[in-house]
Every structure is written in C-alpha cells, then in structure tokens.
Amino acid sequence: MMGWREGDAAVVSTRLVSSVQAVMASSAGCIIASSCRDVMEDRHWLTDAYIMFATPYFAYDIYAMFLCHWHKQRVKGHEEEEGEEELGGVRSLGAAVVGYLRREVLMVLHHVFVVAFCFPASLLWRQGKGDYFQGVLFLAELSTPSVCLGKVLIQYKKHHTLLHKVNGVVLLLTFFSCRVLLFPYLYYAYSRYASIPLYSVPLVAPWQCNLGAALLWPLQLYWFALICRGALRLFARRSNSPP
C-alpha cells in the first residue's frame, strides 16, 4: 500500500475504517434525531438497522485495536525473530495480548459493554421507544475522525504541524459537545418531554438507561481529561520552546 510497511498500512487502514464508521454513525444520528418530533414515540427505520450494523463493528474494533498494538510493538523491536521456534512466537503473541489489555483495558471494557449490554438494551429492551435518543447517541461518534487523525499525525511525527493543532481544537470541541454533554442532554431532553424536573429523570428512567449512563459517562469525562492534558502539554512545550 503506497510503499508503506505492513504495520503502517495496518494502522492507517484501521484508523480510516474507524473514521468512515464514525461518519456513517453521525450521519445516521442526524437523520434519526431530525426526523423524530416526538422523542419517545416517533420511529425511524434507520435506528434498528444501524444498531445491527454497528454492533459487529465494535466487536471487530477490539481486534483492530489489538492489531495496531501488535504492529507498534513489532516496530519497537519487541517481536520475536523470524527464525526462532514456534513456541517463542506463541509467547510473543501472548505477551502482546497481555500488554494490549493492560494498555487499552478501558477501551476494551467500553466496547464489550456496548456489545453485551447496549445492543440488547437498544434493540430489544426499549421496545421501539426513544428512537430520537438513540439517534443522539449515534452522534457521539462525531469526535472519532479527529481522534483517528490525531493518532496518525503523531505516528508520522507530524504533531508540530498546523494541521495537528487545528485537529486538536476540533477534537476538543466535538468530544466535549458530543460526548461530555451527551448524557446530561439526554436527561434534559426527557425532562422537557415529560415536563418533570431534571433531577427527577433518573427516578423514572428505565434502569438500563441509568446503568448505561453511570458506566459510560465517567469514561467520557476521563478521556476528555486526558485530551485536555495532552493539549496543555503541547501548549506548554510551544511556550517554552526558543523563538
């Protein structure tokens, strides 16, 4: 692929697939949310269809992230030599799996939770209610292309370019608006629909909704804090660099 090494091609291809899926999810979310005037009763065929499409993607993405980790470790020189015994290769693969789970444990747990819990909750337990809210949830993927582009730029040591800085600003804005504010907005939208105080929504919302928000929202806050910390470090390095 364009003369790239296998590892580089695999990593960039994985980021590209993630970005394409994110654009599709965001587009589906916009269509669904804009089509539902009644946030609870209105339905759109794209809701269940995209849930069926996106769920296998999250399962695939666990493997794709491992593939990226595996190639990064090989580049760093942690792979076994080509001529060594098969047992050594097995040990190398096992070490890569353990290292991957340690490094990406939160992301893996996030994806497993989406597949094991959010899929049945979205497709079965909600019983056709709340397509609007499902569409808004799809909009969380709007920040993913910026995440992927940032990782590719860092991979190719382009983190000092203007493109990386602009992408960082876009990432901060999209992640904050589409992920950090996501769950508060969902509760706010339901409070307006039901004409009840915002603090009363958790008391009447289905337990599946409360559990999903309780587990997923803290992850978004944590990842946003990491993004802000990275942005501050970049700004500090730029301020301390000689003119």
Short names for language-model regions:
Residues 1-139, 153-243:
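Membrane-helix and juxtamembrane interface regions of eukaryotic multi-pass membrane proteins
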Residues 145-154:
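Juxtamembrane membrane-interface segments at transmembrane alpha-helix termini
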